[in-house]
């Protein structure tokens, strides 16, 4: 698993799909002595629910009609062998249901923009997005985790463009504008609030 941009279930889906209990070691590439080990099984029920906070710059969000999204995803995974994306919560506008896909590599999307937009004439892409991901254990048991996290990020002067929390993955994704040091500010803000976030 060397070289992942962000630790996410789409990157380790074979491990998850087969129910394998395998520890994952995340290494700081600038300082390889710094590592974090993530295990599927909770070692200590009283441990902190947030295990790791990651940030990724240069992302893009695709808005596409729901009826075309499966075609696109199948094509990306099977023909392009590309899976560095996360499906965000859908929305409805003017009676049309849209899906949103967060691409973790904005440069890839720019290179393949014509191909991606070719699946739906109403599809649009927004660039310059940054994503902060909170990964942990049973975060659905944590009272006000989303509100506390978003409030702290807001206090640091950042505008949150999207928050996506999924009980099944115990993951929270926060999308902000990718400019100057926004990602670093958001991560710092969450770390400052971490001590106030506890299990119910």
Residue ranges and their predicted role:
Residues 1-200:
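C-terminal catalytic "cap/lid" subdomain
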């Amino acid at each position: 698993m060397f070289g992942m941009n962000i630790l996410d279930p789409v990157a380790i889906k074979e491990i998850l799909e087969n129910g394998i209990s395998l520890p994952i070691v995340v290494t700081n590439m600038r300082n390889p002595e710094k590592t974090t080990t993530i295990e599927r099984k909770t070692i200590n029920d009283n441990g902190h629910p947030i295990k790791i906070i990651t940030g990724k710059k240069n992302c893009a969000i695709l808005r596409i009609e729901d009826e075309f999204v499966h075609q696109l995803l199948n094509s990306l995974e099977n023909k392009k062998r590309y899976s560095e994306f996360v499906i965000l919560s859908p929305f409805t506008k003017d009676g049309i249901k849209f899906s949103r896909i967060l691409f973790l590599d904005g440069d890839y999307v720019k290179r393949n923009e014509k191909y991606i937009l070719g699946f739906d004439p109403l599809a649009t892409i927004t660039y310059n997005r940054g994503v902060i991901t909170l990964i942990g254990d049973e975060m659905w048991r944590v009272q006000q985790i989303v509100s506390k996290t978003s409030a702290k990020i807001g206090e640091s002067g950042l505008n949150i463009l999207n928050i996506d929390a999924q009980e099944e993955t115990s993951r929270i994704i926060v999308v902000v504008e990718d400019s100057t040091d926004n990602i670093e500010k958001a991560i710092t803000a969450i770390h400052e609030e971490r001590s106030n976030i506890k299990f119910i």
